[in-house]
């Protein structure tokens, strides 16, 4: 970069000043990129070192500002192959260093990708300090100011603007008690088939997937052995059972599982009639349907390096995770057996029904991004529905 180019870049950054105001009054300054519009949401941190496009397109991040702890973001751009859903549902992206794309797979820069999706971003933030703050004090409601418009009561002065933004963060309703699954689910049912198995479609088992925010790679894994019908989150148990499924899959999704009451009732009606497998939000909903309760974690689990112990085998799996709530250990009913635990904080990571064909895990065995240590769980589901 020439001196003139560097000076032009520096001047442009000065004109795009932005800040992230946390509800506890802490302010982080940076430079705006992506869509130039302000947002309010909950700040979380993700410890993954790569896979930012898969993270951005994970519907489980609806309503949240995602802080990436990796030092540099954007250098491999974005492409159509790494998309995990039909859109971006997160409220914003927070990074340390942003770089323009230089990769043969890239079709669009991250900056332009965020602009097209209407998602604001901020870079130049001390993400290490922000992550430590969230770790020590818990996830925070926040206001992200990236627009050119003045904010606050009179738009005068940086301090007044920041104080106004902090108050907006405090007044936001947050994720607790909110049903975001109904906001990210599909509008109508659709079918997913593996191209390699299409000739044998009629002989494959039929899996109905409840879409609470399902990721594309989950559907790919299911389609490796089944005909998959994806249905909206509020589809009744009666309608699902009329489809004569060999198994029902409960997908991942965002926000508070206790608020998704309609799904809990549907799961109760399905249990015992066909095998059930749940992931992430689906795990929490299955557990609630069986009598357990969920609660909020201090700063959640977000990343692709979380160690989980399989209690049956003693094996430790490195897993991809994305959740702010978890099943509370003291509420697990007699009918459920805990199968997996998190080695960082001993929270529940998996359960199995003792008498019915139903099991679930809190983490993401499909990876995307992340390791493949737990893909065997899809094979367990296949064996269960093919008995």
Q: Can you say where each PLM-predicted feature lies in the sequence?
A:
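RNA-binding accessory domains that recognize and position tRNA/RNA substrates
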Residues: 2-243, 257, 368, 380-387
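Short clusters of small/polar residues that mark proteolytic maturation junctions
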Residues: 32-33, 70, 321, 352, ...
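Proline-centered loop/turn at the N-terminus of a beta-strand
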Residues: 120, 206, 275-277, 293, ...
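Active-site glycine-centered loops adjacent to acidic/histidine catalytic or metal-binding residues
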Residues: 126, 280, 323, 364
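Active-site-proximal beta-strand elements of phosphoester/diester hydrolases
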Residues: 206-211, 319-320, 359-363
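Cysteine-nucleophile active-site neighborhood
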Residues: 242, 246-247, 252-318, 326, ...
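Catalytic beta-strand/loop cores that center a nucleophilic Ser/Cys/Thr
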Residues: 314-356
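A glycine-centered loop/beta-turn motif at secondary-structure junctions
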Residues: 350-387
């Amino acid at each position: 970069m020439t001196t003139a180019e560097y000076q032009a870049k520096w001047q442009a950054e000065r004109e795009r000043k932005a800040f992230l105001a946390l509800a506890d009054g802490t302010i982080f300054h940076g430079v705006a990129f992506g869509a130039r519009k302000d947002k309010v949401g909950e700040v979380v941190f993700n410890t993954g070192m790569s896979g930012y496009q898969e993270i951005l397109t994970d519907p489980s991040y609806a309503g949240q500002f995602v802080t990436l702890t990796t030092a540099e973001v954007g250098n491999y751009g974005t492409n159509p192959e790494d998309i995990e859903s039909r859109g971006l549902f997160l409220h914003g992206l927070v990074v340390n260093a942003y770089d323009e794309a230089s990769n043969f797979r890239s079709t669009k820069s991250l900056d332009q990708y965020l602009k097209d999706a209407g998602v604001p971003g901020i870079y130049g933030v001390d993400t290490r300090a922000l992550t430590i703050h969230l770790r020590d004090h818990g996830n925070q409601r926040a206001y992200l100011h990236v627009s050119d418009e003045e904010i606050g009561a009179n738009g005068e002065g940086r301090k007044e603007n920041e104080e106004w933004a902090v108050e907006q963060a405090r007044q936001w309703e947050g994720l607790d008690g909110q049903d975001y699954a109904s906001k990210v689910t599909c509008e109508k049912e659709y079918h997913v088939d593996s191209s390699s198995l299409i000739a044998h479609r009629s002989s494959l088992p039929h899996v109905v997937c409840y879409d609470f925010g399902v990721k594309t790679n989950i559907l790919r894994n299911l389609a490796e052995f089944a005909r998959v019908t994806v249905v909206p989150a509020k589809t009744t148990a009666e309608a699902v059972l009329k489809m004569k499924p060999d198994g029902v899959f409960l997908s991942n999704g965002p926000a508070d599982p206790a608020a998704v009451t309609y799904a809990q009732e549907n799961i109760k009606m399905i249990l015992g009639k066909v095998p059930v497998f749940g992931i992430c939000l689906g795990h929490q909903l299955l557990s609630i349907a069986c009598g357990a309760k969920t609660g909020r974690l201090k700063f959640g689990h977000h990343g692709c390096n979380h160690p989980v112990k399989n209690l049956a085998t003693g094996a430790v799996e490195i897993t991809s995770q994305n959740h702010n709530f978890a099943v509370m250990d003291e509420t697990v009913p007699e009918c459920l057996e805990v199968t997996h635990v998190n080695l960082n904080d001993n929270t529940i990571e998996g359960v199995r029904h003792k008498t019915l064909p139903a099991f679930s895990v809190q983490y993401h065995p499909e990876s995307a991004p992340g390791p493949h240590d737990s893909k065997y769980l899809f094979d367990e589901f296949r064996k269960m529905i093919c008995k």
